[in-house]
């Protein structure tokens, strides 16, 4: 029982960072991510003091901080040069540090409870809270009492969501949900294909594959951005298992057979629900509108992609191309497209600086953990694909990899079988 409480506590900490929210009873207060970041910073300083070797900052944290400071300065210059008061990204260094330290409590608790932090363990908790978000989304959408209960805990713009008739999960919705779901789907595929210990445990593989399908289906009902991660996750799964070459790796034969069987079962269930439930017919039609349009009209299009095609906005003078207009918030340019909003805010200088930081993260982790090379390459691709629709970034997933100890990093690379806690390298 005590172990279950510990695991649930870690899940709450992971959810509070990855799917952060404001409390309904403290709307003007800090969100859960900020609270955890403060707690994480204090815990990090305590661990550094207890280690007796001073403050040991992870190399990737230092590198990310440098990029964040540079990006903040560029945005500050854009605001000052254009004489605006839109400081949306001018304090990005603060955003970076909040993200980085908000996961520290969860990582430390994983180390305390399980003995060491591994990529599969991070995946288990992220998958768990993501499935929780998806299930609560369906419950909220079908049971007003459940939605009222959620609203008593989490502050959301309820009237807005009701006006657009979209599913709200426990603490995330729309494109922010779709991006986060996509990142978790890629992580599932990478862990299933890469970690030999996971592959040996058929029960864990079974649960991960079921979770993959659930997140894909319900996630697309919440936000069709999820389809990006779903498609990329499938490509990663098929590629890494060598299914594409019709010579499936021996250790992946049973995994792919299980996945194929689950796809058949869930597809059959989907067909039944589509034909017997008006609610699920509407949600599935929305979730997979592109596929329905392809089979019915011969074109893979959705209403949202057609709207996005009308949203391309670019600078109209050299100054804006170089340093931007200093305007980001307020939907001033009438576009959601990430590339447009970022370039219009601080020009190509700002955009290149911002994009370079995510190239750095992918490069750093791909070199540090070569077994997971393809995961980080796909995360890099995801960074630039997401900006075709929204301007959010994917820092929230990278920060979970910031805090491995040297021994844990060796274990991830298959060098040592066990890890002992020490300060992060």
Give the residues covered by each predicted segment:
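Hydrophobic transmembrane alpha-helices and their immediate junctions
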Residues: 235, 345-386, 410-413
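TM-adjacent membrane-interface loops and short helices in multi-pass inner/ER membrane proteins
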Residues: 286, 290-334, 348-350
